[in-house]
């Protein structure tokens, strides 16, 4: 079995309730042959909102030595019908809104999403935070600049955020970097 599929769209609404809504313009190609699926192309995220009231399921991954069994005690093997190879550029407009865990703001940037068969997903690129607010411990901070950079495995980004707050009756600005 072989297939070569192109998928192009403009301003498509995508949602993953209750946390994520997006408007995207995908330009993707999928090639299927034997036991391989290769996905490449570009996805433009025109608008979006991510709400993180609580950490999503899977935020804390299981140890590699965990074995999952069924009711009879037999190991459940997660067989995939295809070895998946991914090479997709994701361009996120800075109108993407994020809310949760004390943060409200926007982010945007470009990420290259790559994955080889049976390997972890990798991200390369950076997201900028053009504006935002962070509230914790009765303190309200304005995010004046921020960058989330990825250079490999997706769960290990480099985060650089500068947040400040003005003390109203004084000419003082305090913050964290």
Where in the sequence are the language-model features?
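Strand-loop-strand
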Residues: 1-177
């Amino acid at each position: 079995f072989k297939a070569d599929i192109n998928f192009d769209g403009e301003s498509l609404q995508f949602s993953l309730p209750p946390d994520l809504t997006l408007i995207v313009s995908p330009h993707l190609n999928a090639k299927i042959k034997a036991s391989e699926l290769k996905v490449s192309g570009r996805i433009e995220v025109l608008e979006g909102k991510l709400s993180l009231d609580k950490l999503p399921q899977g935020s804390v991954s299981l140890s590699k030595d965990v074995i999952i069994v069924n009711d009879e005690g037999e190991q459940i093997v997660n067989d995939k019908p295809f070895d998946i190879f991914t090479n997709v550029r994701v361009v996120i407009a800075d109108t993407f809104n994020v809310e949760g865990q004390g943060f409200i703001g926007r982010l945007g940037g470009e990420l290259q999403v790559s994955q080889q068969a049976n390997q972890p997903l990798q991200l390369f690129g950076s997201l900028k935070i053009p504006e935002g607010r962070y509230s914790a411990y009765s303190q309200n901070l304005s995010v004046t600049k921020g960058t989330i950079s990825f250079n490999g495995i997706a769960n290990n980004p480099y985060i650089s955020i500068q947040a400040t707050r003005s003390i109203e009756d004084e000419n003082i600005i305090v913050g964290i970097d």
